[in-house]
Regions:
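Structured catalytic-domain cores with a bias toward divalent-metal coordination
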Residues: 1-173
Length: 173
């Protein structure tokens, strides 16, 4: 099921819309969210979301709970392959948790955070831009190390980085 989280009118009969794909099965009440597309020039996350949704739908009987996939938090940036939100000169990942009374982008960030509340786990997928290649990695804030490192070790990724840099970037998702 596709649900619209944010929908705002734009000039020339266009809409700024953020949607999520809800895949649910069984009676389980656990909820996992996967978000990507915060930066419009980081495209690998859309492929990951597609593959996860495909696998879940092909093996729905193995799912006992809910997975919510947000493939494009910055759809305007993705459409134009720009890191930030075009014409706003704004990095969306620096305005969380947003503001319900702020600009369009701040309102969108607020609605995203509100929609993610209550999730048991949120994966925020980032990648390099079109001109760089990085080693796959998991970044975990030191405050969540005890809970998240055991989960990260199950991802078959060689580089798990535990750091406290999120205290410097308090406005990131």
């Amino acid at each position: 099921m596709i649900k619209t989280i944010v929908s705002t009118a734009l000039p020339i009969n266009e809409r700024f819309a953020i949607r999520k794909n809800i895949i649910k099965n069984g009676k389980g009440n656990r909820r996992v969210c996967i978000v990507t597309g915060t930066h419009g020039d980081e495209l690998e996350g859309q492929m990951v979301c597609y593959l996860v949704a495909k696998q879940l739908n092909e093996h729905i009987d193995l799912l006992d709970g809910t997975v919510e996939i947000y493939p494009a938090l910055n759809p305007l940036g993705i459409d134009t392959i720009q890191r930030g939100i075009p014409n706003f000169d704004l990095d969306m990942n620096r305005i969380f948790p947003g503001n319900p009374n702020g600009t369009m982008a701040e309102q969108a960030a607020h609605l995203i955070v509100e929609d993610l509340k209550g999730a048991d786990l949120v994966f925020d997928i980032h990648s390099s831009n079109l001109y760089l290649r990085e080693t796959p990695q998991v970044r975990i804030n030191v405050l969540n190390e005890k809970e998240l490192v055991p989960l990260a070790q199950r991802l078959n990724i060689d580089f798990v980085w535990v750091h406290d840099a999120a205290t410097v970037l308090e406005s990131t998702l």
